[in-house]
Amino acid sequence: MATIIYDDETTFDALKDRTIAVMGYGSQGHAHARNLHESGLNVIVGLRQGSSSWAKAESDGLKVMTVDDASRAADVIMILLPDEKQAAVYYSQIEPNLKAGDALVFAHGFNIHYNQIVPPKDVDVFMVAPKGPGHIVRRTYTEGIGVPGLIAVYQDATGKARDLALSYAKGIGATRAGVYETTFREETETDLFGEQVDLCGGLSALIKTAFEVLVEAGYQPEMAYFETCHEVKLIVDLIYEGGLERMWHSVSNTAEYGGMTVGPRVINEYSREAMYEALERIQNGEFAKEFVLEGMVNHPVLKAMERQEKEHQLEVVGKQIRANIPWLNKKIDDD
């Protein structure tokens, strides 16, 4: 079982005399920078010159520099850039400014685990990964609570890497909900697996296929959308709040019996075998190699798949239905 560390077991001592540079001011970047700043820590934001986020970060009361200048000024550097952009920025603007005893921080282990970034031996390398989107990390912090997080130490050059990770996690509010100790390998491989077979890939494929089956069988696309896509949130919210047990308890007996008897026929041993194949490609680096090579040529396959998704009948019908739900449109705009 994982080791869990809570707020009253941590302090800011490891970071009190350090300068933290948060590279990026997107979903996670703005939450990390503002939470750390409001926790009383010394924070600067690193952005490319001319970034549209520059003025926003300054208006939030933060000091902003270029990535090059920020990495020179800081001794704890959190890289919150897209996975495919991290290595190029690191080697051109961060590594040349690293000093012995500095710390590199990541919120996902992809680039370290797959050797896209190979840090010098005289710096600490650790991970702090909140298990929630940036706006939730920020909102829960302001409410005096937090989202759970993960910490991992990859390289402990100073003997202080774990203490730094815990202080950083405390600074963004994660220790309020508990932080779980893991490794870069475990976080990376389980995160990619979840994205591919369940949360993003598996769920979207299941929704689309179920929608297509109903439409092909002659049912109205609108009815198919409601039953296979729109209502997913209702079920997921129940699972999120109380696990599968809460969901089964909350649905009708008809839904429970049908779901329990038919579900295993749909997600069956063939599906399990495909999941193991996906996991193997993650573990042996095949997926990482494929993704990195795809990025080197500007993601032609990804862009083609994105176009196909936008043109799918599910998306066309979904946009029409959502247009008739004003409160839903307002919520999306607010987020």
Swiss-Prot record:
It comes from the Archaea. One of its GO terms (molecular function) is NADP binding. Residues 1-182 form the KARI N-terminal Rossmann domain. Pathway: Amino-acid biosynthesis; L-isoleucine biosynthesis; L-isoleucine from 2-oxobutanoate: step 2/4; Amino-acid biosynthesis; L-valine biosynthesis; L-valine from pyruvate: step 2/4. It catalyses: (2R)-2,3-dihydroxy-3-methylbutanoate + NADP(+) = (2S)-2-acetolactate + NADPH + H(+); (2R,3R)-2,3-dihydroxy-3-methylpentanoate + NADP(+) = (S)-2-ethyl-2-hydroxy-3-oxobutanoate + NADPH + H(+). Pfam families: KARI_C, KARI_N. Substrate binds at S252. Signal peptide: none annotated. Coiled coil: none annotated. One of its GO terms (biological process) is L-valine biosynthetic process. Residues 183-328 form the KARI C-terminal knotted domain. It is an enzyme of class 1 (oxidoreductase). The active site is at H108. Mg(2+) 2 binds at D191, E227, E231. Its EC number is 1.1.1.86. Keywords: Amino-acid biosynthesis, Branched-chain amino acid biosynthesis, Magnesium, Metal-binding, NADP, Oxidoreductase. Involved in the biosynthesis of branched-chain amino acids (BCAA). Catalyzes an alkyl-migration followed by a ketol-acid reduction of (S)-2-acetolactate (S2AL) to yield (R)-2,3-dihydroxy-isovalerate. In the isomerase reaction, S2AL is rearranged via a Mg-dependent methyl migration to produce 3-hydroxy-3-methyl-2-ketobutyrate (HMKB). In the reductase reaction, this 2-ketoacid undergoes a metal-dependent reduction by NADPH to yield (R)-2,3-dihydroxy-isovalerate. PANTHER family: KETOL-ACID REDUCTOISOMERASE, MITOCHONDRIAL. HAMAP family: IlvC. Belongs to the ketol-acid reductoisomerase family. This is Ketol-acid reductoisomerase (NADP(+)).
